[in-house]
Amino acid sequence: MITFPNAKINLGLNIVEKRPDGYHNLETIFYPINLQDALEVTRRENNDKEYTLHISGSPLEGEPEDNLVVQAYKLLKKDYPGLLPVDIHMYKHIPAGAGLGGGSSDAACMIKLLNDKFSLGLSTERMEEYAVKLGADCAFFIRNKPVFATGIGNLFEPVELSLKGYHIILIKPDIFVSTRDAFAEIKPVRPAVSLKEIVKQPMETWKNSMKNDFEDSVFKKFPEIAAIKDELYDLGAVYAAMSGSGSSVYGIFKAPIENVEDKFCGCFCRQRALE
């Protein structure tokens, strides 16, 4: 059984307050995009191991047992001891450390895949409860529809938003942005206007009203990321922003851009139609 975990972008990201537990409350809009990994699970014939994990495509750091798809399997195995041994094959196309939620999407899709393959009978709500244990934004990918996210990115409210007909260009430079450092530079401020209201306005107004709070500190430290955003606007983007804490930057366009890869040499560069 195979599935295709997709990425997401953040439309705006406001850090609104620091919590007593040291985390930050935020507000953002998660929007799914058609940039996908591939995840396949097969019944393991040899029962000498509970699982094996084979990763191809973009390289991933870390040990297999720390990968979120393995953590998802172990989480369900704890409650369903009869879960059979599996071979997990994952092709990574969504770049890691990009603010695109690739790892979270893989984990959520693993939960859905195991539920279907082994007929666990989990409801959507129950799968969301499992997913949030693996990461704040994991549960988003269970329903995989646009949401207004609050809390630490784990509380969701559906939003009526469709970007169908637009095209997205996604750029990921070979730069690692520490999420911890990015948060350390933030001074939380509650926005005067909620993102829920901003996205109801024409996209042409978003440039001046919808902001990612991480951009100020990240762009100061990595001006080359800021330059990517500027270049996307120069190419005609209606709206451009960094996703999450970076380092990926996206631009939303009314039509496809030809030969865009030539303009961002040395970067991960993909163009997709939005749905």
UniProtKB/Swiss-Prot annotation:
ATP binds at residues 95-105. Keywords: ATP-binding, Isoprene biosynthesis, Kinase, Nucleotide-binding, Transferase. Pfam families: GHMP_kinases_C, GHMP_kinases_N. The active site is at 8, 137. GO terms for biological process: isopentenyl diphosphate biosynthetic process, methylerythritol 4-phosphate pathway; terpenoid biosynthetic process. The keyword Nucleotide-binding applies. Its EC number is 2.7.1.148. Pathway: Isoprenoid biosynthesis; isopentenyl diphosphate biosynthesis via DXP pathway; isopentenyl diphosphate from 1-deoxy-D-xylulose 5-phosphate: step 3/6. Catalyzes the phosphorylation of the position 2 hydroxy group of 4-diphosphocytidyl-2C-methyl-D-erythritol. NCBIfam families: ispE. This is 4-diphosphocytidyl-2-C-methyl-D-erythritol kinase. It comes from Phocaeicola vulgatus (strain ATCC 8482 / DSM 1447 / JCM 5826 / CCUG 4940 / NBRC 14291 / NCTC 11154) (Bacteroides vulgatus). The lineage of its organism: Bacteria, Pseudomonadati, Bacteroidota, Bacteroidia, Bacteroidales.
